[in-house]
Amino acid sequence: MSGNTLGTLFCVTNFGESHGPAIGCVVDGCPPGLPLEAADIQAELDRRRPGTSRHVTQRQEADQVEILSGVYEGVTTGTPIGLLIRNTDARSKDYSNIADTFRPGHADFAYWRKYGVRDPRGGGRSSARLTAPTVAAGAIAKKWLAGQFGVRVRGYMSQLGPIAIPFSSWDDVPGNAFYAPNAAVVPELEAYMDQLRRDGDSVGARIEVVAEGLPAGWGEPIYDRLDADIAHAMMGLNAVKGVSLGAGFESIAQRGSEHGDEITPEGFASNHAGGVLGGISTGQPITVSLAIKPTSSIRVERRSVNRAGEPVMVQTLGRHDPCVGIRATPIAEALLALVLIDHALRQRAQCGG
């Protein structure tokens, strides 16, 4: 199966399945000399870890990362960094009833038509479980970007289902399970999710990710544009159905006199461009919005077919996130950091900066 590697100079190859012995990644191209220990990576993994609240899957995975290579005496050596996360709480029997059927909205049908075989246990390769190695690699990227350029990447949830979450403060984000930037809205979110779980259904979300502190000049023209690579990476996150930068789809209703960010001696007067013009960073914060669809694995019965093409009713049992957007924030942060470190290294290679 191809398509498992992200990046040009800072490359991350992801491997494993949801119910296999382990998942992990190989990070190739990390500069040498970066102080790195497992605790640096674990802090990010713990933000994404399942079973941390009643609003996410109750699968209990410690997600303890093992650094297999590429680090010696606490610093990176410049050689490939092998990261391993063992699966310890898989319950494959929960999927025996859907081994020969296709769940509506899931990757089951598409995988089977492409490969002629699929692993139904927890979604196999298409499971959101495979985002853990992405977060692990992103932790390395975050640390390097912060140390070299002072770049900070962070995110939050701006909408859960029909509930908009007005931004209040970054300080509110780590204090709740939703990564909501407004503590006053959290009780409403909790009540909504409690009812959703009782209904056996799921819902989507909107996530915002912001990168601050990067210089102008990162990115490439035409095919390797910085914004194109960001969109490419974000669409690799399970359940993402839309990506926009800056004003995004609101640009449709704007006039050019409003949308074009005016430039003053002090800098840009606005940031409708989301920090990227012509595929290259402007030095403004990069702002990315993600639309995340409802989880496909739900207890509500839906119509489908089996491998013989016969009509069936599908009900997915097991442990699932009723809203995958709740745990998506640290994953989206990791993906943005991975794209940025790759372009930082490309800029250094081409222009020396």
Curated annotation (Swiss-Prot):
Which terms are listed as keywords in the entry? Amino-acid biosynthesis, Aromatic amino acid biosynthesis, FAD, Flavoprotein, FMN, Lyase, NADP
The record's SUPFAM superfamilies line, in alphabetical order, gives: Chorismate synthase, AroC
Q: Where does NADP(+) bind?
A: R48, R54
Which residues of this UniProt protein bind FMN?
Answer: R125, S126, S127, N238, A239, G278, K293, P294, T295, S296, S297, R319
Which cofactors? FMNH2
Identify this protein by name. Chorismate synthase
Under the heading Pfam families, the entry gives: Chorismate_synt
**What's an example GO cellular component term for this entry?**
cytosol
- Cofactor remark: Reduced FMN (FMNH(2)).
Q: Which family does it belong to?
A: Belongs to the chorismate synthase family.
Annotated TM spans: none
